[in-house]
Amino acid sequence: DFGKGFYLTSIYNQAVRYAERFKRRGRDAWLNTYHFVYQPEEWKVLTFEAYDAAWLEFVSTCRAGNDVSDSDMVVGGIANDRVILTLDRYFAGEISQEEALGLLRFEKPNIQYCIRSERMITQCLNYIDSKEL
């Protein structure tokens, strides 16, 4: 959703559901656990609090292959199944931005972290373990 980066979530069930998608395709699925600590004032962090016009524009730009942020990390809602359906309809031109935002306003964002700077990864992220699902 936020372009190239190292993606994390603090929601265990969300991570499991995402990994299980690989299992359904006949691939191995692993759940990696990390310790992630950062001081927000030391990093450029772009945060989206809701599925709003700014989030929709940023995701649209990233999905078009354009990198528009120099942030060390982007934080915001992940596109779950219902959100993906709305995005697909919006990108296909089936619904307007206003209609998409009207549908998205009822969704509570499941937060994801997209670390986009190698420096932040090396300074703030520590591997703990892996578990095969």
Identify the meaning behind each predicted range:
Residues 1, 16-17, 21-133:
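Conserved NAD+-utilizing ADP-ribose enzyme module
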Residues 2-7:
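A short, exposed loop/beta-hairpin motif centered on an aromatic-Gly-Thr core
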